[in-house]
Design a protein with these regions (language model features):
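Long, repeat-rich segments with strong aromatic
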Residues: 96, 100, 107, 111-152, ...
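A residue-level signal for conserved active-site and pocket-lining positions in enzyme catalytic cores
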Residues: 89, 171, 394
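Short alpha-helical "patches" and their helix-cap loops
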Residues: 36-45, 101-108, 151-164, 420-425
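Carbohydrate-active enzyme catalytic cores, enriched for enzymes
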Residues: 136-304, 355-357
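Single conserved hydrophobic/aromatic residue that forms the stacking wall/gate
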Residues: 1-5, 9
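Generic, well-ordered alpha-helical scaffold segments in large soluble proteins
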Residues: 24, 92-95, 113, 144-151, ...
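Active-site lining segments of carbohydrate-active enzymes
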Residues: 11-130, 239-248
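Non-catalytic C-terminal accessory modules of carbohydrate-active enzymes
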Residues: 153, 240-431
Length: 432
């Protein structure tokens, strides 16, 4: 028991929980201070004091919180915590701080921090964390940027930057249909996003794709649904809902979406095929060892799937993460090479990644995602989408063959192997 440990309780921490609560309390203080003062002035004084000590002072005087990314090392991770926490802090400063010089310094500090999140994200806008995290990643970044623009009278606005638009459109491009979304990494397989948020983001960045997608999502929901969310999103929805409801729901899934830096590729055709493939590396945010994997949807129904993630536990975010089966490459649509699975780490990645939109063809060398003991020189995994077919081809060269290679396919359908040389998979009436 040390003296340092005995002082831990005195330290203030800004995390998701503290930030969410503080931003809500700041709105409460902003609107209800006169009412509190009529009851007892101590209520608002105590509330203002706690917000000052716990959030405003702590944010300006501390720089060790990992999500701030002020001490980011090469290869370090910046995820949704960054825009989410900074958005909460920005609300607190705009609602509470009356000293213009102090406010300016605080706003600039949040801008410097959020820059690290934007710079971490590839220019193509792909969200490594998946669609179910988009609302907390790009979505919270939009909230932050919108409040920053509003709070500065539009003088500080970067909605015209291509990366911001690309980050927004990811949510529309990752939608398969009937509630299904592409769910690489820890993302959920069902979702679609917050229609009101997506519409506002699309309007701010000039994206017809996002606005039509938002109108489509809204057309699927209860027309009498009550706007909800944190105070800022709630107020924004009240201002934009009527415009959203008046927009035509003419969304159509793009024929393909190619993310050359994130190395995500989605291909569709007019016969109901939707193929999602990836290259990438095995240290992405919410990472699975899944370099080169794919999912296939037929008439919006998942056939070959990504199992996603189970309930989060202590094990999920510990050194034991890759002992969980859903994180391992042998439980993705990938090969075991010489009996060896892919390995975790930034150095285990796809190489020679390419996409040909004219021929709907994606390929990657995934040998570089396997450790040395796999004894593989090259393994080109390719996907070619035809009118009524998806051709998956493995072309490889080994240093030596020690064990039979095993090609894995994950499906939740009924598998029929009764016909020699053929395998049929049926999912809710859809057969491949």
């Amino acid at each position: 028991y040390s003296s340092a440990a005995s002082d831990v309780y005195k330290r203030q921490v800004i995390d998701l929980g503290a930030g969410n609560l503080a931003s809500q309390l700041s709105w409460i203080y902003y609107y209800l201070k006169p009412s509190f003062d009529k009851v007892n002035p101590l209520i608002s004084k105590r509330l203002r004091h706690e917000l000052q000590v716990r959030i405003l002072d702590t944010y300006m005087n501390e720089d060790h919180f990992w999500w701030m990314a002020f001490h980011l090392k090469p290869g370090g991770l910046v995820n949704n915590w960054n825009p989410w926490c900074n958005f909460n802090v920005l609300q607190c400063f705009f609602l509470l701080e009356n000293d213009r010089d102090k406010l300016a310094k605080a706003v600039y500090r949040t801008m410097t921090s959020v820059d690290h999140f934007i710079n971490y994200t590839h220019g193509d806008g792909g969200c490594e964390e998946g669609p179910s995290y988009w609302g907390h990643a790009a979505g919270k970044m939009y909230d932050y940027l919108q409040m920053l623009s509003d709070g500065t009278g539009g003088k500080v606005s970067i909605f015209d930057q291509p990366i911001i638009k690309n980050m927004g459109e990811y949510i529309a491009r990752s939608y398969v249909g009937n509630g299904w979304v592409v769910n690489f990494a820890d993302a959920s397989a069902k979702g679609g996003g917050d229609a009101d948020l997506i519409f506002r983001y699309g309007k701010a960045t000039g994206s017809p794709l996002m606005m039509s997608y938002a109108a489509y999502l809204k057309s699927l929901s209860d027309k009498d649904d009550i706007p909800s969310g944190d105070p800022f999103r709630l107020f924004q929805t009240l201002l934009s809902r009527e415009e959203l409801e008046g927009r035509s729901a003419d969304y159509q899934s793009p024929s393909y979406s190619w993310y050359p830096e994130t190395e995500f590729c989605y291909m569709t055709n007019k016969n109901g095929f939707f193929v999602a493939t990836k290259g990438g590396y095995n240290n992405e945010s919410h990472n699975h060892n899944d370099v080169g994997s794919f999912s296939l949807y037929l008439n919006t129904m998942p056939v070959f799937i990504d199992a996603g993630v189970g309930t989060y536990t202590r094990q999920t975010f510990s050194s034991e993460r890759y002992s969980i089966w859903t994180m391992q490459s042998n439980y993705h649509n990938l090969p075991l090479i010489n009996g060896v699975a892919q390995r975790f780490g930034s150095e285990y990645k796809a190489t020679e990644v390419q996409f040909d939109p004219k021929h709907m063809y994606f390929s990657a060398n995934i040998a570089t995602a396997y450790p040395e003991e796999a004894n593989v020189k090259k393994w080109i995994r390719s996907y070619r989408l035809g009118k009524n077919t998806l051709k998956i081809e493995d072309s490889f060269s080994l240093d030596r063959a020690e064990r039979p290679n095993q090609i894995n396919f994950l499906t939740w359908g009924k598998v029929d192997i009764s016909v020699p040389g053929a395998v049929t998979v049926e999912v809710n009436g859809e057969k491949v």
